[in-house]
């Protein structure tokens, strides 16, 4: 049996294969995927995993915001690609679209995982915001659930920061990248950003993509920032201190939500910044509790686990209804 999960990440498309007791991973940069044909993407998947597409039992796919549907369903039953609009918060490269279309047209059985939004089954108070999280974060949460945790908060900290709360195996709320805690590149629009948008200096999406902690530094990207932090350069440490503080605040807010469900839970950190030791120590100190860490592959692995369990007949994943087959 072979099950594949696909994480539509900010910088790369990550793939995970679960075959028996073995798990394998690889990634394609989004720009690299955009330059490939659909068949080249499928061939790359076959070559990296050493399998033939005809032997894949089910693929679980994530794409962009996933805000046009609210149940896990056959990818071929989606309207368009499952989005209300292609416009929104984030950079467009075409890589995710190319991978989505390659899977959709491949003939391989595939399901699409939705994001969380106002049509989702979450705490109704969270619906003050139109969108809570993109679909790949459900992959991270499901992987944690598969590790044996039923109540937890997970914060994915990288280019942006998104935090989810899970109570009794169901996701009850999340805080999206454009709402509160900044990541390296992305963050919420503050007063000056709103003025800039209103004055036509930049679009709201551009303002979102430039609202992260990187703007406090002379560095050009996440890799340069983390290298500078390893060298203990003060601008880099200030940026990571900022990210850590706001991520801890976001985690604490999700813990308050868990209390309303009469539970407390473990805290997990994910993402390329969340797994950075300096950030982990800062967040632990802010929260006064231990935090477990996940690597960058766990969204894709969790999606593969969703594919495996849906294939086995599971009708609900993290409280999200399964409408397949």
UniProtKB/Swiss-Prot annotation:
InterPro entries: ATPase_NBD, Methan_mark_12. Belongs to the UPF0285 family. NCBIfam families: methan_mark_12. HAMAP family: UPF0285. This is UPF0285 protein Mbar_A0208. It comes from Methanosarcina barkeri (strain Fusaro / DSM 804). The lineage of its organism: Archaea, Methanobacteriati, Methanobacteriota, Stenosarchaea group, Methanomicrobia.
């Amino acid at each position: 049996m072979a099950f594949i999960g696909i994480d539509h990440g900010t910088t790369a498309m990550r793939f995970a294969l679960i075959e028996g007791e073995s798990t394998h991973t690889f990634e394609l940069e989004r720009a690299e995927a955009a330059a490939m044909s659909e068949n080249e993407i499928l061939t790359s998947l076959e070559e990296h995993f050493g399998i033939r597409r005809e032997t894949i039992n089910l693929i679980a796919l994530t794409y962009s915001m996933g805000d046009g549907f609210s149940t896990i369903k056959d990818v071929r039953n989606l309207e368009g690609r499952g989005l209300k609009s292609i416009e929104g918060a984030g950079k467009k490269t075409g890589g995710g679209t190319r991978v989505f279309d390659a899977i959709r047209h491949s003939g391989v059985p595939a399901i699409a995982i939705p994001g969380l939004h106002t049509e989702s089954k979450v705490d109704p108070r969270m619906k003050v915001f139109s969108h809570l999280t993109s679909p790949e974060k459900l992959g991270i949460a499901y992987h944690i659930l598969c590790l044996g945790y039923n109540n937890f908060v997970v914060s994915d900290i990288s280019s942006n920061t998104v935090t989810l709360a899970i109570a009794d195996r169901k996701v009850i709320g999340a805080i999206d990248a454009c709402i509160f805690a900044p990541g390296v590149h992305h963050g919420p629009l503050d007063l000056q950003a709103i003025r800039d948008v209103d004055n036509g200096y930049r679009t709201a999406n551009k303002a979102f993509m430039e609202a992260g902690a990187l703007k406090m530094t002379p560095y050009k990207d996440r890799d340069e920032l983390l290298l500078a932090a390893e060298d203990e350069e003060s601008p880099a440490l200030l940026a990571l201190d900022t990210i850590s503080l706001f991520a801890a605040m976001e985690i604490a807010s999700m813990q308050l939500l868990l209390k309303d469900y009469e539970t407390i839970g473990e805290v997990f950190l994910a993402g390329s910044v969340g797994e950075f030791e300096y950030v982990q120590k800062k967040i632990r100190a802010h929260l006064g509790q231990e935090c477990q860490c996940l690597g960058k592959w766990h969204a894709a692995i969790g999606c593969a686990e969703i594919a495996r369990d849906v294939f086995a007949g599971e009708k609900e994943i993290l409280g999200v209804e399964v409408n397949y087959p």
